[in-house]
């Protein structure tokens, strides 16, 4: 009788352990999924993988005679009624030369909207050598109805691009931006990325 009574208790403990293991697995997978995006972003920023550009705080001390053609692409994801485009479609700086270009963004909706620009460089091998000193993509951007901003990007191409086997034959790179809608409170941070107000339509 004692053995029969102990069997259900043992089975209950085993079932409890199985449930605990399953819950631990589910929570563990959830935590890994949550961490995967920021970890992947950090990996791309460090390695330049997938055309992710580098953020730097100082300019290049070496400027080569060779030039690099840089073209620009601007896109807006669904959810933002913005007109977003580069002021110049392409530039031809010397490799290592620090240069500033500008994009404009105009809110064509009747409400304040917030956006975050996501960027990449093609071909992907050039991403690690594309260094940004200043960029509106470093912060979120708020635009009031009818408001238009002029947003600078300061960058240079690392001279090491001509020495690397995978990138030495690259002569044209494309810097591409896509603005995505961003939810949240509306701080006074529109100009933190260097944006300048151009006009406000009443």
From Swiss-Prot:
Periplasmic compartment segments: 37-202
Annotated segments matching region Disordered: 183-202
Lineage: Bacteria, Pseudomonadati, Pseudomonadota, Alphaproteobacteria, Hyphomicrobiales
Gene3D superfamilies found in the cross-reference section: Ctag/Cox11
Family assignment from sequence similarity: Belongs to the COX11/CtaG family.
Segments on the Cytoplasmic side according to the record's topology features: 1-13
Subcellular location, record wording: Cell inner membrane
Transmembrane annotation, as ranges: 14-36
Coiled-coil segments: none
Protein name from the UniProt record: Cytochrome c oxidase assembly protein CtaG
Membrane association type: Single-pass type II membrane protein
Any single GO CC term annotated in Swiss-Prot or TrEMBL for this entry: plasma membrane
Alphabetic keyword roster: Cell inner membrane, Cell membrane, Copper, Membrane, Signal-anchor, Transmembrane, Transmembrane helix
Pfam family, one: CtaG_Cox11
Function, in words: Exerts its effect at some terminal stage of cytochrome c oxidase synthesis, probably by being involved in the insertion of the copper B into subunit I.
GO terms for MF: copper ion binding
Keyword Cytoplasm included in the entry's annotation: no
């Amino acid at each position: 009788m004692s053995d029969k009574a102990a069997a259900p208790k043992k089975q209950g403990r085993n079932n409890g352990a199985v449930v605990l293991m399953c819950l631990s697995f589910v929570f563990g997978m959830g935590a890994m999924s949550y961490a995967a995006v920021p970890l992947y972003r950090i990996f791309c920023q460090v390695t330049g993988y997938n055309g992710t550009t580098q953020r730097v705080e100082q300019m290049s001390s070496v400027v080569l005679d060779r030039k690099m053609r840089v073209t620009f692409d601007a896109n807006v994801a669904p959810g933002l009624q913005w007109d977003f485009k580069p002021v110049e479609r392409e530039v031809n700086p010397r490799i290592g030369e620090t240069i500033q270009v500008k994009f404009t963004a105009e809110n064509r909706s009747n409400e304040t909207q917030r956006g975050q620009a996501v960027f990449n460089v093609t071909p992907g091998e050039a991403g690690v050598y594309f260094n940004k000193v200043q960029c509106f993509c470093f912060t979120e951007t708020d635009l009031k109805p009818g408001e238009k901003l002029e947003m600078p990007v300061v960058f240079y191409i690392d001279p090491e691009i001509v020495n690397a086997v995978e990138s030495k034959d690259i002569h044209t790179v494309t810097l591409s931006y896509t603005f995505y809608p961003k939810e949240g409170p509306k701080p006074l941070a529109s100009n933190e990325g260097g944006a300048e107000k151009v006009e406000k339509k009443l």
